[in-house]
Amino acid sequence: MKSFLDSKITSPLVHRLDSEKTLNFKKYQKKFEDLYKNELSSSSFKKSFFNIFTDVNACPYCNRNFINPIYKAKQLGKDYKKWSPDIEHFYPKSIYPFLSLSISNLLPSCTFCNKIKSNYDTYETCKSPYEMKDNDISFKFLPLDNQKRLISVESKNNIKNIELFNLDDLYHDVHSNYVNNIFLNINKNPIENRKYLKKFFSLSLDTQDKLYKKKFCNYYQERDFNKQPLSKMTKDLFFHIKENELK
């Protein structure tokens, strides 16, 4: 996500605390809230906004759900708003109204993550998807009975994205079958898969991309993780298999 913007927010500018609720602050706060409500919440703005993120097909918060907008003429009373993902404020507009209009604070989001996050103040605890790196969050696959795996999601530097979006439970409860099926297929043909790994790391990056996508039906490079759900988890699973299952 960080490739979409050249600038970043280094300070939330104004934090709405009780001690800061002066008349001037309230006046400008109301102006920003009205401007967002009347202009940036419109269907035309939503369409322009999502056009910026044409290659972002998966929610940048959870990487679990597709977020592609669908544009059609009005049908059974539905308009663009009903056919698009949510626009999420990383710093909540209820707390940082001056950032409600900042493109650096806006992200496409699945409805699930938007509702979970709600008005939670992310300033000191979470990291924006614009700033996230591949190793900020990692997936571990712990052995259980019957050759199954427990999916564990871990964070670097104590960022709270995992706790906020409940990623640990969601990934394990919802996507365990996906992971366990990959393990099952790998263990059926260990010799063939060892040959695959040996060949894989001797190839060019472009060829690796093609070979990886053919086998795992997902993207190998971090820059492409937003193109398809579960891409980050699948990449971590691939390296777990390389280092632990097919030595």
Regions found by a protein language model. Name each.
Residues 116-170:
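Domain-level detector of nuclease and nuclease-like folds
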Residues 52-56, 102-106:
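Short metal-coordination and nucleic-acid-contact micro-motifs, chiefly zinc-binding Cys/His arrays
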Residues 1-47:
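N-terminal accessory alpha/beta regions
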Residues 63-105, 119-123, 128-134:
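Histidine-centered nuclease catalytic patch
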Residues 25-28, 33-36, 61, 66, ...:
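Aromatic side chains
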Residues 42-50, 94-100:
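Short, intrinsically disordered, charge-biased short linear motifs at domain edges
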Residues 59-62, 110-113:
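Short cysteine-rich clusters marking metal-coordination/redox-active sites
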Residues 5, 156-247:
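C-terminal, charged low-complexity interaction regions
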